[in-house]
């Protein structure tokens, strides 16, 4: 495991330069179409950019063109699930949210790193931007049963500013009988260039998925039904 972690950090340190230069195994998830994701897509739209609505700062004004994908004028589209499954994986993307908005990226569809307008907040929990989302119960009503894992610091930018998230995720390990012998891990996560998680074990999945069976591989999921969010330059690379 130590050798794997060392390799992961070497990959991570060079990863973004590679993503922006040579392909080096990186897969572009948001190109000219959404073919990397399972249908249906709902109200996802390709645009040139977004800006805050001066009259309604919880909404975006979209600019015609290409290069950015957002979840439509209502801020409520289908969650995206990747066609490809991943085990150990590295992801880089840029995101933009208006005031009060909420999204997230889930590894294996189970382990969520939160995307939220947490600009200026001092007392952080896993429900804040970059946090590892709290576990939750659905009944009798949706409620958190813990605080999740807070980011090490608040690196969240102001609503309307483009932000970057870089994550190295290591899948759980299982023996020949299928018994888990190693927890999943966020080997490293960086929000806007600042380390927010380092070698953070994930004892269970997050949110209401925490009781679900864990897997060697699973899809990436992008949450799109909790308010406006825009993405660009989303790239993923499997770690061998």
Q: What spans do the regions from the language model cover?
A:
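Sec-dependent N-terminal signal peptides
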Residues: 4-13
